[in-house]
């Protein structure tokens, strides 16, 4: 009845224009890694020591490739999220930052794998990048610790099978899992069919599957950006003065 009312009173008065184009275009890969340097405001006279941020962000794969998405999420945790993580440990030992972290955003059409250093200095950017590449290259040659991978996979499998999502309702998490694929014209049900994928990921522990992912997506892939965020005393005041000047011109 409600739908009929909406149609009779509103929708029927409009002409159907055809199919809505909701396709999100894929961003072409960069020919080479981009570099960005930006500034954030700190108080005038403030000590800027160890207040620089460096980040390497990499576009990796496609959200509709659920197996690869899950595998890269596992890799991010293994490489960066624990005291035993080899990439995190290498960056801390190299002194490129006081804090090292990572993130993996798999809900975008083109997921993003990020490696971050905070509490750093501007001149440490090149060292930050070189340590990342050297460590990842060493891992692809010598192999990733399969015990770390297996532990991460066991934890993921437990959460999925037991619907253990902490304080979050399982229905909400299932809905998000469905939408991550459905939003980009993938099969929504595939986001819930994890048994086969978990088996394939576990089989990958016996091969170079994870090392190959590192090679293909993190090393040989040029769709990357290096971002350095530096402190700039007095920037807030300068930006405010420019905004006041801009508004004055608009009012004139």
Language model segments and positions:
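Edge strands and adjacent loops of beta-rich recognition modules
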Residues: 41-47
């Amino acid at each position: 009845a409600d739908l009929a009312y909406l149609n009779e009173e509103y929708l029927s008065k409009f002409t159907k224009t055809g199919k809505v184009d909701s396709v999100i275009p894929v961003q072409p890969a960069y020919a080479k890694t981009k570099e960005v340097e930006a500034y954030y405001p700190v108080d005038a006279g403030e000590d800027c020591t160890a207040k620089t941020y460096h980040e390497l962000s990499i576009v990796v794969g496609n959200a509709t490739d659920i197996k690869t998405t899950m595998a890269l999420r596992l890799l991010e945790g293994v490489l960066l999220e624990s005291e035993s993580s080899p990439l995190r440990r290498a960056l801390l030992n190299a002194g490129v930052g006081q804090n090292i972290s990572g993130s993996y955003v798999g809900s975008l059409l083109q997921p993003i794998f990020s490696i971050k250093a905070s509490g750093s200095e501007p001149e440490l950017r090149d060292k930050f990048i070189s340590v990342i590449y050297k460590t990842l290259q060493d891992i692809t040659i010598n192999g990733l610790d399969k015990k770390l991978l297996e532990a991460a996979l066991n934890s993921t499998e437990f959460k999925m099978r037991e619907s253990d999502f902490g304080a979050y309702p399982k229905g909400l998490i299932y809905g998000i899992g469905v939408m991550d694929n459905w939003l980009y014209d993938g099969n929504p049900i595939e986001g819930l069919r994890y048994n086969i994928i978990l088996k394939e990921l576990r089989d990958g522990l016996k091969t170079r599957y994870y090392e190959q992912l590192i090679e293909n997506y993190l090393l040989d892939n040029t769709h990357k950006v290096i971002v350095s965020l530096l402190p700039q005393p007095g920037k807030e005041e300068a930006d405010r003065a420019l905004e006041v000047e801009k508004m004055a011109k608009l009012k004139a």
